[in-house]
Protein backbone atom coordinates (compact mmCIF):
# COMPACT_ATOMS: atom_id res chain seq x y z
CA UNK A 1 0.00 0.00 0.00
CA UNK A 2 1.31 3.43 -0.94
CA UNK A 3 2.10 6.34 1.36
CA UNK A 4 0.24 9.64 0.92
CA UNK A 5 1.81 12.32 -1.24
CA UNK A 6 0.60 15.91 -0.77
CA UNK A 7 0.27 18.34 -3.67
CA UNK A 8 -0.95 21.87 -2.93
CA UNK A 9 -2.35 24.37 -5.43
CA UNK A 10 -2.99 28.03 -4.70
CA UNK A 11 -6.74 27.94 -5.39
CA UNK A 12 -9.54 25.47 -5.94
CA UNK A 13 -9.84 26.53 -9.57
CA UNK A 14 -6.18 25.83 -10.23
CA UNK A 15 -6.49 22.52 -8.41
CA UNK A 16 -9.39 21.39 -10.61
CA UNK A 17 -7.54 22.34 -13.79
CA UNK A 18 -4.34 20.61 -12.65
CA UNK A 19 -6.16 17.43 -11.63
CA UNK A 20 -7.93 17.36 -15.01
CA UNK A 21 -4.60 17.62 -16.83
CA UNK A 22 -3.07 14.94 -14.60
CA UNK A 23 -6.04 12.67 -15.24
CA UNK A 24 -5.76 12.99 -19.03
CA UNK A 25 -2.16 11.81 -18.81
CA UNK A 26 -3.03 8.88 -16.54
CA UNK A 27 -5.90 7.68 -18.76
CA UNK A 28 -3.82 7.99 -21.93
CA UNK A 29 -0.99 6.02 -20.32
CA UNK A 30 -3.38 3.26 -19.22
CA UNK A 31 -4.90 3.01 -22.69
CA UNK A 32 -1.47 2.86 -24.28
CA UNK A 33 -0.46 0.05 -21.93
CA UNK A 34 -3.47 -2.23 -22.26
CA UNK A 35 -6.05 -0.65 -24.58
CA UNK A 36 -8.47 0.63 -21.94
CA UNK A 37 -8.61 2.62 -18.72
CA UNK A 38 -10.79 2.57 -15.62
CA UNK A 39 -11.88 5.52 -13.52
CA UNK A 40 -13.96 5.88 -10.36
CA UNK A 41 -15.86 9.16 -10.27
CA UNK A 42 -16.88 11.20 -7.25
CA UNK A 43 -19.39 13.95 -6.65
CA UNK A 44 -19.13 17.08 -4.58
CA UNK A 45 -18.03 20.56 -5.56
CA UNK A 46 -14.41 19.69 -6.28
CA UNK A 47 -15.13 16.39 -8.00
CA UNK A 48 -17.59 17.97 -10.42
CA UNK A 49 -15.29 20.96 -10.98
CA UNK A 50 -12.60 18.53 -12.12
CA UNK A 51 -15.00 16.96 -14.64
CA UNK A 52 -15.94 20.40 -15.96
CA UNK A 53 -12.27 21.26 -16.39
CA UNK A 54 -11.64 17.90 -18.02
CA UNK A 55 -14.27 18.63 -20.67
CA UNK A 56 -12.26 21.62 -21.93
CA UNK A 57 -8.73 20.40 -21.14
CA UNK A 58 -6.31 21.07 -24.03
CA UNK A 59 -5.30 17.40 -24.36
CA UNK A 60 -8.82 16.04 -23.86
CA UNK A 61 -8.87 14.59 -27.37
CA UNK A 62 -6.02 12.25 -26.51
CA UNK A 63 -8.38 10.12 -24.39
CA UNK A 64 -10.53 7.56 -26.20
CA UNK A 65 -13.62 7.81 -24.00
CA UNK A 66 -15.21 4.79 -25.68
CA UNK A 67 -12.47 2.73 -23.99
CA UNK A 68 -12.82 4.14 -20.49
CA UNK A 69 -14.66 2.04 -17.89
CA UNK A 70 -16.47 4.40 -15.51
CA UNK A 71 -17.63 3.65 -11.98
CA UNK A 72 -18.80 5.65 -8.98
CA UNK A 73 -17.34 5.67 -5.50
CA UNK A 74 -20.72 6.42 -3.99
CA UNK A 75 -24.18 7.58 -4.93
CA UNK A 76 -27.04 9.39 -3.30
CA UNK A 77 -29.98 7.00 -3.30
CA UNK A 78 -32.42 9.23 -5.15
CA UNK A 79 -34.61 8.89 -8.26
CA UNK A 80 -33.08 8.74 -11.73
CA UNK A 81 -32.14 12.19 -12.97
CA UNK A 82 -32.41 13.86 -9.57
CA UNK A 83 -30.08 16.88 -9.58
CA UNK A 84 -28.38 15.74 -6.37
CA UNK A 85 -27.34 12.37 -7.79
CA UNK A 86 -23.63 12.15 -8.52
CA UNK A 87 -24.45 10.45 -11.82
CA UNK A 88 -26.68 13.34 -12.93
CA UNK A 89 -24.00 15.91 -12.11
CA UNK A 90 -21.27 13.88 -13.82
CA UNK A 91 -23.34 13.54 -16.98
CA UNK A 92 -24.02 17.27 -17.11
CA UNK A 93 -20.38 18.16 -16.41
CA UNK A 94 -18.68 15.67 -18.74
CA UNK A 95 -20.26 12.40 -19.79
CA UNK A 96 -22.97 13.89 -22.01
CA UNK A 97 -20.24 15.72 -23.91
CA UNK A 98 -17.87 12.85 -24.74
CA UNK A 99 -18.27 9.64 -26.72
CA UNK A 100 -18.51 7.16 -23.85
CA UNK A 101 -19.60 3.58 -24.42
CA UNK A 102 -22.90 3.30 -22.48
CA UNK A 103 -22.08 -0.30 -21.64
CA UNK A 104 -18.94 0.83 -19.85
CA UNK A 105 -20.68 3.47 -17.72
CA UNK A 106 -21.54 1.49 -14.61
CA UNK A 107 -23.93 3.54 -12.49
CA UNK A 108 -25.31 2.70 -9.08
CA UNK A 109 -29.05 2.00 -9.01
CA UNK A 110 -31.52 4.81 -8.37
CA UNK A 111 -34.32 4.69 -5.81
CA UNK A 112 -36.90 4.40 -8.60
CA UNK A 113 -35.01 1.63 -10.38
CA UNK A 114 -35.43 -2.12 -10.46
CA UNK A 115 -34.67 -2.52 -6.76
CA UNK A 116 -37.16 0.10 -5.66
CA UNK A 117 -36.50 1.83 -2.38
CA UNK A 118 -34.07 -0.87 -1.21
CA UNK A 119 -30.50 0.45 -0.96
CA UNK A 120 -29.21 -2.88 0.36
CA UNK A 121 -30.34 -4.58 -2.84
CA UNK A 122 -28.82 -1.75 -4.88
CA UNK A 123 -25.51 -2.19 -3.04
CA UNK A 124 -25.52 -5.96 -3.59
CA UNK A 125 -26.22 -5.39 -7.28
CA UNK A 126 -23.29 -3.00 -7.65
CA UNK A 127 -21.04 -5.51 -5.93
CA UNK A 128 -22.09 -8.00 -8.62
CA UNK A 129 -21.33 -5.40 -11.29
CA UNK A 130 -17.83 -4.97 -9.90
CA UNK A 131 -17.28 -8.72 -9.68
CA UNK A 132 -18.38 -9.18 -13.30
CA UNK A 133 -15.97 -6.43 -14.40
CA UNK A 134 -12.99 -7.81 -12.49
CA UNK A 135 -10.33 -9.52 -14.60
CA UNK A 136 -8.32 -12.61 -13.61
CA UNK A 137 -5.28 -10.41 -13.01
CA UNK A 138 -7.26 -8.36 -10.49
CA UNK A 139 -7.16 -11.35 -8.10
CA UNK A 140 -10.51 -10.64 -6.51
CA UNK A 141 -14.05 -9.41 -6.94
CA UNK A 142 -13.18 -5.74 -7.50
CA UNK A 143 -11.39 -4.30 -10.54
CA UNK A 144 -7.98 -2.71 -10.00
CA UNK A 145 -9.15 0.78 -10.96
CA UNK A 146 -6.50 2.93 -12.62
CA UNK A 147 -7.65 5.99 -10.68
CA UNK A 148 -10.21 6.39 -7.91
CA UNK A 149 -11.25 10.02 -7.41
CA UNK A 150 -12.50 10.87 -3.93
CA UNK A 151 -13.55 13.90 -1.96
CA UNK A 152 -13.03 14.56 1.74
CA UNK A 153 -15.73 15.88 4.07
CA UNK A 154 -15.38 18.32 6.93
CA UNK A 155 -15.57 15.46 9.44
CA UNK A 156 -13.23 13.27 7.40
CA UNK A 157 -15.64 11.09 5.44
CA UNK A 158 -14.78 9.89 1.96
CA UNK A 159 -17.15 8.33 -0.57
CA UNK A 160 -20.09 7.79 1.81
CA UNK A 161 -18.02 6.17 4.53
CA UNK A 162 -18.54 8.34 7.61
CA UNK A 163 -16.63 8.32 10.91
CA UNK A 164 -17.62 5.53 13.33
CA UNK A 165 -20.37 4.35 10.95
CA UNK A 166 -21.06 0.67 10.17
CA UNK A 167 -19.52 1.19 6.72
CA UNK A 168 -16.12 2.10 8.13
CA UNK A 169 -15.92 -1.26 9.93
CA UNK A 170 -16.82 -3.29 6.82
CA UNK A 171 -14.09 -5.72 5.80
CA UNK A 172 -15.84 -8.27 3.58
CA UNK A 173 -18.24 -6.48 1.23
CA UNK A 174 -17.15 -4.20 -1.59
CA UNK A 175 -20.33 -2.09 -1.62
CA UNK A 176 -22.73 -1.23 1.19
CA UNK A 177 -25.93 0.67 1.78
CA UNK A 178 -25.47 3.66 4.05
CA UNK A 179 -28.41 4.89 6.10
CA UNK A 180 -28.81 7.84 8.46
CA UNK A 181 -25.95 9.81 6.94
CA UNK A 182 -25.17 12.97 8.92
CA UNK A 183 -25.34 14.91 5.64
CA UNK A 184 -28.38 14.92 3.34
CA UNK A 185 -29.61 12.87 1.66
CA UNK A 186 -29.57 10.30 4.47
CA UNK A 187 -29.52 7.16 2.30
CA UNK A 188 -26.67 6.29 -0.03
CA UNK A 189 -24.73 3.46 -1.65
CA UNK A 190 -20.95 3.41 -1.28
CA UNK A 191 -17.79 1.51 -2.03
CA UNK A 192 -16.10 0.34 1.14
CA UNK A 193 -12.53 1.15 2.10
CA UNK A 194 -11.29 -2.34 1.12
CA UNK A 195 -12.79 -1.85 -2.36
CA UNK A 196 -11.23 1.60 -2.67
CA UNK A 197 -7.87 0.13 -1.71
CA UNK A 198 -8.01 -2.14 -4.77
CA UNK A 199 -7.30 0.96 -6.89
CA UNK A 200 -3.87 1.43 -8.42
CA UNK A 201 -4.08 5.12 -7.57
CA UNK A 202 -6.33 6.99 -5.13
CA UNK A 203 -6.62 10.76 -5.52
CA UNK A 204 -8.23 12.59 -2.61
CA UNK A 205 -9.24 16.10 -3.62
CA UNK A 206 -10.55 18.82 -1.35
CA UNK A 207 -10.59 22.58 -0.93
CA UNK A 208 -11.43 25.19 1.67
CA UNK A 209 -10.51 26.00 5.24
CA UNK A 210 -13.45 23.97 6.60
CA UNK A 211 -11.60 20.82 5.50
CA UNK A 212 -8.23 21.77 7.00
CA UNK A 213 -8.66 20.04 10.36
CA UNK A 214 -9.80 16.73 8.85
CA UNK A 215 -7.01 16.81 6.27
CA UNK A 216 -4.40 17.45 8.96
CA UNK A 217 -5.74 14.61 11.10
CA UNK A 218 -5.78 12.17 8.18
CA UNK A 219 -2.22 13.00 7.20
CA UNK A 220 -1.09 13.21 10.80
CA UNK A 221 -1.82 9.59 11.63
CA UNK A 222 -5.51 9.44 12.61
CA UNK A 223 -7.17 6.05 12.24
CA UNK A 224 -9.79 5.35 9.59
CA UNK A 225 -12.58 4.85 12.12
CA UNK A 226 -12.12 8.45 13.24
CA UNK A 227 -11.18 9.86 9.81
CA UNK A 228 -12.24 7.43 7.06
CA UNK A 229 -10.28 9.36 4.42
CA UNK A 230 -7.12 8.23 6.20
CA UNK A 231 -7.93 4.67 5.14
CA UNK A 232 -8.26 5.47 1.44
CA UNK A 233 -4.98 4.33 -0.11
CA UNK A 234 -3.95 3.23 -3.57
CA UNK A 235 -1.85 0.16 -4.29
CA UNK A 236 0.76 2.21 -6.15
CA UNK A 237 -0.01 5.83 -5.37
CA UNK A 238 -2.07 7.96 -2.98
CA UNK A 239 -2.36 11.66 -3.77
CA UNK A 240 -3.82 14.33 -1.53
CA UNK A 241 -4.64 17.19 -3.90
CA UNK A 242 -5.39 20.30 -1.88
CA UNK A 243 -5.79 24.02 -2.20
CA UNK A 244 -3.84 26.27 0.12
CA UNK A 245 -6.76 26.67 2.54
CA UNK A 246 -7.34 22.92 2.94
CA UNK A 247 -3.61 22.38 3.50
CA UNK A 248 -3.31 25.12 6.13
CA UNK A 249 -3.03 22.79 9.13
CA UNK A 250 -0.97 20.01 7.58
CA UNK A 251 2.50 19.69 9.17
CA UNK A 252 4.94 21.71 7.08
CA UNK A 253 7.21 18.70 6.69
CA UNK A 254 4.49 17.03 4.60
CA UNK A 255 3.69 20.01 2.37
CA UNK A 256 5.87 20.69 -0.69
CA UNK A 257 6.05 24.11 -2.37
CA UNK A 258 2.92 25.18 -4.26
CA UNK A 259 2.46 23.35 -7.54
Segments and roles (model prediction):
Residues 2-3, 63-146:
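Ligand-binding beta-strand-loop-alpha-helix segment within the catalytic cores
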Residues 59-69, 98-100, 167-169, 194-199, ...:
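Short, conserved loop/helix-junction motifs that constitute active-site signature segments
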Residues 147-194:
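Class I SAM-dependent methyltransferase SAM-binding "motif I" and its flanking Rossmann-like core
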Residues 194, 200-259:
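ATP/nucleoside-binding phosphotransfer catalytic cores, i.e., glycine-rich phosphate-binding loops
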Residues 41-46, 150-154, 207:
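Glycine-rich beta-strand-to-loop/alpha-helix junction loops that act as flexible
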Residues 1-39, 120:
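N-terminal glycine-/serine-/threonine-rich phosphate-binding loop
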Residues 53-64, 88, 92, 163-172:
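A glycine- and small-aliphatic-rich helix-loop capping segment at beta-alpha/alpha-beta transitions
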Residues 31-58:
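Glycine-rich N-terminal segment of FAD-binding domains in flavoprotein oxidoreductases
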